[in-house]
Amino acid sequence: MSIKYIASSKLPTPWGVFEMHGFEDSETGKEHVALTFGTLSPDAPILGRIHSECLTGDALFSLRCDCGFQLQTAMQNVAEEGQGFILYLRQEGRGIGLLNKIRAYELQDQGANTVEANERLGFEADMRKYDMIIPMMEKIGVAKVRLMTNNPRKVKAMQSFGLEVVERVPLQVGKNRYNEGYLKTKSTELGHMMSEHHFTDADTEAKKD
């Protein structure tokens, strides 16, 4: 395995102080991060999330996806739980990279959906891999997970690596007029387990504020 642990530090956030653990993939040069909160036990089911990098959603507040909403909600949920983890994986654009993601967005602006755009660029709908989580989970000492995700591929990935997914916790947030089609495509073509009636509508929440 090419993933190497590098260092840890405190990370103060609006939801509390997390511990940030840095990892480096010597084969790809990519740097991944595990955030932990509270005391984690290998014997207890721990609330957590596998989150793939989304610069546009996580840092630039894009409404084209639900990624930023999911990350913030997951961190808040972990803090409220008193313990948990977030694995932040550098797999921008479902694995195609930032510039190709912008190219895909350009095609989406012309009418393609998120899957069609990737395929027109010569990529699979989802290029992500999850084998890097094995040493990351070993480092933070978690073996049983209550996984916050709508994506069955993440559940299967954890199970295939010998981790026990005790519960799948839906994370359905961030629906708005800009990403309705994107969310529908994730459900119908990528198999994400989502029910429209259980979404928090970001537009509605903004109006409440």
From Swiss-Prot:
Binds 1 zinc ion per subunit. The lineage of its organism: Bacteria, Pseudomonadati, Pseudomonadota, Gammaproteobacteria, Alteromonadales. The active site is at D126, R128. The gene is ribA. Its EC number is 3.5.4.25. HAMAP family: RibA. GO terms for molecular function: GTP binding; GTP cyclohydrolase II activity; zinc ion binding. It comes from the Bacteria. Catalyzes the conversion of GTP to 2,5-diamino-6-ribosylamino-4(3H)-pyrimidinone 5'-phosphate (DARP), formate and pyrophosphate. NCBIfam families: PRK00393.1, ribA. Zn(2+) binds at C54, C65, C67. It comes from Shewanella halifaxensis (strain HAW-EB4). It is an enzyme of class 3 (hydrolase). This is GTP cyclohydrolase-2. Keywords: GTP-binding, Hydrolase, Metal-binding, Nucleotide-binding, Riboflavin biosynthesis, Zinc. One of its GO terms (cellular component) is cytosol.
